[in-house]
Amino acid sequence: KDKNKKNTYDGKISLNFPGSEINTKYKIIDNLISINSEKSNLKKNNISYEGIISASPFYYNINVNLESLNILKFIENLSKLNHLLDEKILLDKKVNGTILLNVDYLKGIKIFDKAKIKINFVNGKLILNDSLLISNKIGKMYFNNSFIEIVEDRKILKSKIFFEIESQKKLYQKLQIPKKNRIKLENIYLEVEKDLDIDEIIINKFIFNKQITNTSLQKSIDLSDSLDINEINSLKNWIEVKKFSKNIFSNLD
């Protein structure tokens, strides 16, 4: 038997359901599977993807490009799939891989236009480091030390979020903050925590103008202890978010 001879297969898989058509071309060489999309759409939005899947050892690396994504519906659907975040399924320590999701247009969110969401499954953790929300006019929001892990049978999300503001004028206009209450704002920093089975979020840190380097000219303002978490968790729409933001800036010393 020729040990150098490789087992090679190729083909195409098509999935059709209301408003969507997913066509995947694949090629299998021994334990390695490569996939590519072909003229696919998801809920009438164009989608393309490519990647590799290794059967032994098992891992995957997949890039997905989405024409648009409704972020609120995406989060809602994720909560419905909460049961998949289980030690025996996606958070199994034997499941390792990376999915990079590039979104050209975000729906359902007022400030941000695009997204790059990097999802890593590593040794029982879902890691979101290097994920990014982009506002063409205002700035970029970076997610660092962001992960989901199981702690005492609870699925816990933790994240450090850094919102780099490139145009404070545009941000203030978006939030309708009166000019008399505006400050020089370079960034907003948050540390958040959420039990995925509970409909509330905990904010451990909330800082305006976090000092990143010694050359920063703006004074850091730590609001972590003054936030009303119950009020934050009760926010239901953009009007309430703007009202909440106005109250924060009007109460700054």
Regions found by a protein language model. Give the residues of each.
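Membrane-proximal interfacial segments on either side of biological membranes
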Residues: 1-253
